[in-house]
Structure formats: structure tokens, C-alpha cells
Amino acid sequence: MQGANLKVLPSTRAAAKELVDPLDITNVGWSTLEPKFDELMQLMDAPSSGINALAARSAHREKVGAVIEQLLTRAQDESRRLLVEGNGEAAAEAGVKTLRLKERFYGKGSVKLVPAHFHLARTNQFLKRYGNAEEILSLAHFIILQNPDEADATIKAELHQTFGLLYAADNKLDVSVKHLTCATYYLSVMNGPEHVLTTFAYFDLANVFATKACMEAAMALYDTVKNIWLKHLRRVLKDIVDETMAAKLVKRYDDDEVTHEVGHASARAFGKENLADVSKMLFGIFSIQKERLTISHPTTARAQFLLGLYLLWVNKNDEAAEHLLSARTTSQKFYGERHPIVQDIEDWCIWFEIPFRGVAAEQ
């Protein structure tokens, strides 16, 4: 009967209990994280019997161990989410709990602990506890030095980047430059010096130079970021244009709507966190160059053109149109209406159906 409360007999209740999967971590929260971890650790060490007991025990340990790793990864991700949302104290508490469980599972000297140290360092930096953050990063550095064969360029790049941003926040700019330079080197080794992921290091380094009032060095690095991203965005946007044109050629009916949605898969594949960082970086460069050089400068126009292309990539065409039209107006005034730079901006407007003829962007 709908809405009625059903009574469960003891035998049925026991049977239902037996159906609970001990490896299920779907509904584990912070209050049940440690008890579930203890349960899984005991389960992993449970003895096996029968034929091929040794092989069965090994397979069992591997299976349960994989679940524990998933549980710890989820805890680390949740700790990071708390920090992103600005809840520093909760992120610190969650980070400490996660680190302690990782120490029990991996051992206190394992490289697998380093991401937890990075999180706690960033959390303490957010809370302006710079001394604590430096101490935590020093522990991470010691673990990396103790495990040279397991510490790859990725973890070294993150170590130096985290150190560099910490020292920048603490106004220790010279040592910040040293660490961010090391981070740039490792990212270049991993991805190449002209890869879009390496631009994050260039941007961090440029910001420190700007804080030190070394504006020539800062502007040179900002322009390096712009050049790398312009090359990348031209390529991925050209793919989107080509896909759209191909779709128009094969559409069956005149009233079919052809959009750019398919091509934007490259933006989605880049990841939400990376896209958020890129947005912050490109808007930051535009704002800095607008403030230093004014909106009418061709360098600022190039930054605004780049920002427009990025917004096209993430499918924010209305916002992109504002920046592209403004960049076109500035470029027309500086170079002339028939200059290749102006023509380039107009080509992208045509390809993405942004009207520009007779449009004057506000300066």
C-alpha cells in the first residue's frame, strides 16, 4: 500500500544487512570517513583460505586497496573544493584529516603524501599563516628529495610554483622569482616552452615582476603568454569553423540549424579548472595593459582581441563580440582600416557571424 510503513522481520533485516557492499563508498561523508577507512583497512588485512589462498589474498588486497585510494582521492578533492569556495578553516581541517589517513595507508615518507601537503600549504597561505605554509612545503620538499626516482617533473613544478606563490603573497619577491623560474623550467621540460600549460608559470612570474616594478620584464612575459594563446586559439577555432562549414554543406534541409557546439569539445576537454585559470589570466593581462597603456594602445587591442577569441572558444559569443569590436576599432585607428591586423579581426567576426560593418565600439 502506498504511503504505508512496512514492518521488517529480523530475518529480512539481517538479509538486507548482508547485501550491503562493504566496498561501497558512495555515501561516505566527513563524519564517516575515518570509520569507513578503518573498516576498509581491516577488510584489506582479512585472511584468505582454501586453494591458492596466497593469490586470492593478493587479489583481495589489491581490490580493497584500490577502493581506499578512491576514498582518499575523493577526500582530497573535497578538501580542495572547500578551499576554492573560500572556506579556509574547513579546508584546513579536512586537509589535516586526509593527510593523516594517507600517512596510515601509504607511509609517512611516501610521495603520495605530497599533494596533501600542497593543499595544506595553499590553505595556510589563504589564511595568511605564511610560516605554517612554508613549514608544510619544506616537509613536502624533503619527501621529494628522499624519493628522487618517484618525483617527476610534474610534482617538482608544482612544488616550486606553490613556493613561489607563497613567497609572493608574503612579499618575499626575490625568492619568489627564483622558485617561479624553477617552476617555469620544469613546465617547459614537461610540455614545451610554447605550450599553453606553460603560460601559467609565465603569468605568475610576470605578476611578481610587476609587483617589483620591473614592468619591462612583466610586459614581455605577458606578451609571451598572449602569443602562445593566440597561436593555440587560432588553431582550435579554425577547427570549429571548418566543422561548422562542413555541417552546413551536408545539412538536409534549409531550416536546419547549424551551430558551433560540436567544435567546442576542445574547450570542455581542457577542463573547468584550467579554463577558469585561463579566463582569470587573460582578463588579468587585458586589465593590466589597459591600465598601464590605455585602451587605445595597440598592445591593449591585441590583448582584447585574444580575450575575444578565448570567449569564442568557450562559447560566450555575445561577450566575445564586445571585445572583438573594441579591438577592431582601436586597431583601425592605429593601423588603418585595410591593415592585415584589422582584416584578421574582421575575418573572425565573419566566421562567427558577428556583425561589424557600421559598428563603432565604445572606447
Swiss-Prot record:
UniProt xrefs under SUPFAM superfamilies: TPR-like
TPR repeats: 157-190, 199-232
PANTHER family (alphabetical): ZINC FINGER MYND DOMAIN-CONTAINING PROTEIN 12
Gene of this entry: TAX-1
Assembly with partners or alone: Interacts with TTC29.
Presence of the UniProt keyword Cell wall biogenesis/degradation in the record: no
Protein name: Protein TAX-1
Higher taxonomy: Eukaryota, Discoba, Euglenozoa, Kinetoplastea, Metakinetoplastina
Keyword Nucleotide-binding on entry: no
GO biological process, alphabetically ordered: cilium-dependent cell motility
